[in-house]
Amino acid sequence: MRFKNLNPLEQHTARLLLWSALFNGVMISLNQTQDIIARKALHAEVWQLTVMAMIWPVSNFLSIWWGRIFEKSQHKSRYFILVGVLGRLSLFYGLWLTGMNEFMLLMGLVFSFNSLQIPAQNTIWQRNIDSGKRGKIYGYTISLGVFVAVVFTFIAGRALDRNENLFRLILTITAVCGFIAAFLLSLIRIKEKPDEPIHPKLSLKETLTDPIKRTLTLLKKNKPFAAFERSFSIYGMGFIMVQPVLPIFLVDMLKLSYTGNFIAKGIISQIPMLFLSPYLGKWHDKLHPFRFICVFFGLLALFPALIVCSALTLKWHLLSVTLAYVAFAVFGVAMTGVNIAWNMGSIFFAGKEDASMYQGVHVTMTGIRGILAPLLGLLLLKTTGIISVFAVASCFLITASIISWRDYKRLHI
């Protein structure tokens, strides 16, 4: 990446963001493979996989409080240290991990502090990087992180096929790399607003209620942002509801090894992010978010549809596996765009306001659908079968795409 077009602050920020992304790639690998580890190594039951799928989105409920605290703080770097120590080094407990319930608690702790890092990191992007350069630089950080994730995922898959208990060592390595990634973010000098007031200290009651009131006010006054959240909520229902059943499909029905599973979830699905992120990031800078998400929600609808095709051709194993791998390739392309919009979209709607609060609301909304979607997936799995879960998910994604396009036309943007 060339730094000559960046001012000194942008260069300082971009370098540290890239170094952080390098180490965060190992965290990305864990995010993609945790459910396979749960099903194969820890023999997770269906209800545990459902809870596992809920942990990430439900822990995001904390984001509006984290975002508000971060917005008011005069010492922002300390929060990245907090993420590193409690939300990353806690994975060291993996050395003594013996059961699935412990693994769920551990991942709950990790994702709870992740809900602090996301809005905090958005403040860095908003204040330190010019809007015309933001998407492209973000794309490079994603590509670098994904490159590390792909390499680490392949090595981890091969290691686990040789010795399943090595997942404990993998968690330990992830702890160290995750801490370094968070520590590097703490070194970034966040540009302060020239007119930023010194925030008065809030009472405990105000600390608990103020973010909720502000969230409702924000969604009420900023109609385009509320429409953006509506589209993402519909998309999220389709995306999250398949998460508990994916490991069941890959492990129990396709009977893939660790390497086979990790190739699908951690390599094929990630390679498009590796190569496309800088280009789609630049494209995101030029398009309105509604147009952008319309395209990628629609493309993502093909993923569960292809999984249905794979499930219907199980007696032809090679064809079934090939269709599943094609599905994950489509997933990778679509999610490259969705992830860029998920992380950058709220900055667009924030305008000159603090992006951390907007992203806090955005992340917290994930928690609402995170309660409903996995339960809906489990209900469909138990009553009508696994194929219906993917079919309904595809319908949600198509609906999100159509509504996003209608919102774009309705707002005359």
Task: Label each residue range with its predicted role.
Residues M1-F70, P224-K265:
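Helix-loop boundary and gating motifs at the non-cytosolic
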Residues M1-Q11, E192-R230:
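Juxtamembrane intracellular "pre-TM" segments in multi-pass secondary transporters
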Residues L22, N101-Q117, L318-G337:
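Hydrophobic core of transmembrane alpha-helices in multi-pass small-molecule transporters
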Residues T33-A41, R68, K72, L95, ...:
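Transmembrane alpha-helix termini and helix-breaking/packing motifs in multi-pass membrane transporters
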Residues L62-H75, L160, F275-P289, L381:
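Helix-to-loop junctions at the C-terminal end of transmembrane segments
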Residues E71-G84, D285-L300:
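Cytoplasmic membrane-interface "Motif A"-like loop-to-helix N-cap segments
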Residues G84-G99, G298-H317:
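C-terminal ends and interior cores of transmembrane alpha-helices
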Residues L116-I129, T336-G351:
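Intracellular juxtamembrane helix-capping segments at the cytosolic ends
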